[in-house]
Every structure is written in structure tokens, then in C-alpha cells.
UniProtKB/Swiss-Prot annotation:
Subcellular compartments: Cellular thylakoid membrane
Source organism of this protein record: Parasynechococcus marenigrum (strain WH8102)
Membrane topology: Peripheral membrane protein
Lineage: Bacteria, Bacillati, Cyanobacteriota, Cyanophyceae, Synechococcales
Amino-acid positions noted as binding heme c in the UniProt annotation, renumbered to this chain: 70, 73-74, 137
Signal peptide residue numbers: 1-33
GO molecular-function terms, A-Z: electron transfer activity; heme binding; iron ion binding
Family that this chain belongs to: Belongs to the cytochrome c family. PsbV subfamily.
Official protein name in the record: Photosystem II extrinsic protein V
Length: 170
């Protein structure tokens, strides 16, 4: 009986040592640490190239606002209504005007234009200009738009090609 108790006691001690180590690996893995470094959180702020660094909390807030306001059509950085135009970095950079910076994305959310910049699509695409089309946009503040833009630009740095890559990643 004593040897059984000793064996159980040793096993329990081993588990007590192992559990915190496993929790630490799950909560603070090297991939997680790299994911939120300053370089990852830094994105172009305007067309001139001025950089802006967001905090992890700001990006998480931007993600929540994005998922609530835009996620119905743009989950994972795709565009459900037009798979040719997503939110991946290359597509944003090739738009006219380029939408690969915070200011340009905020401007687009306020008054969207076609991909070539030739005409307004505010009557078709949710925006601040015509919040009747999609009421979720109605009460968004400029700060929330800025945080969503930050999230859109940071997401591909964290998710890689899965952001804007389409349904093969879901």
C-alpha cells in the first residue's frame, strides 16, 4: 500500500511540474511573441509613407469592430461579392488610389470608389457616406475606422497568405 501511495505521489509531483510548463507554452509560445512585435504592428499611415505603430489592444479592438461591421462580406480579408478584389496587401496597393495605408482605408470607408477610382460606389458598398445601406456603419467613429484600417493592414503580417487568400484557407 505504501509503495502504491509513493508511486502516485511521484506521478502527481511530475504532473504539477509539467502542467505549468505546458500552460506557459500554450499562452506564450514563440510564435505568439513574434506575432505582436513592433515591426508587425507598424504599418503605413498615409500615402507619403509615414509609419504608425498600433498597440496589440488597438489591433484587437480593430478586429472586433471589423468583424462586427465588415466581417459579413469580408471575413478573412476576402470580398464575398467580388473575389477578384480582396483586402490582401497586393490588391490594396494596386488600387487607384492605393489603399495600402491607414488614411486611404479610412477615406475608402467614408466614401468608397471603384477599384480604379473612377466613380463612387457609395450606393452599393457600405460606407459612412450612406449608412442607410448598412446600418452597422452608422455609428462608427473616426477612431474605430482608424483601428479597423490598422487591423486590415496588420492581419496579413500575422495570418500570411490566408488573409485575403480565399476559401482554400477556411
Amino acid at each position: 500500500m505504501a509503495s502504491l501511495f509513493s508511486t502516485l505521489q511521484r506521478s502527481l509531483k511530475g504532473l504539477l511540474i509539467l502542467v505549468p510548463v505546458l500552460i506557459g507554452l500554450v499562452l506564450a509560445s514563440p510564435a505568439e511573441a513574434v506575432r505582436w512585435d513592433a515591426e508587425t504592428l507598424t504599418v503605413p499611415g498615409n500615402p507619403e509613407g509615414t509609419q504608425v505603430t498600433f498597440s496589440e489592444q488597438e489591433i484587437n479592438t480593430g478586429r472586433k469592430v471589423f468583424n462586427t461591421s465588415c466581417g459579413t462580406c469580408h471575413a478573412g480579408g476576402i470580398t464575398k461579392t467580388n473575389q477578384n478584389v480582396g483586402l490582401d496587401p497586393e490588391t490594396l496597393a494596386l488600387a487607384t488610389p492605393a489603399r495600402d495605408n491607414v488614411d486611404a482605408l479610412v477615406d475608402y470607408m467614408k466614401d468608397p470608389t471603384s477599384y480604379d477610382g473612377e466613380y463612387s460606389i457609395a450606393d452599393l458598398h457600405p460606407s459612412m457616406r450612406d449608412a442607410e445601406l448598412y446600418p452597422a456603419m452608422r455609428d462608427l467613429t473616426d477612431e474605430e475606422l482608424r483601428l479597423m484600417a490598422g487591423y486590415i493592414l496588420v492581419a496579413p503580417k500575422v495570418q500570411g497568405t490566408a488573409w485575403g487568400g480565399g476559401k482554400i484557407y477556411f
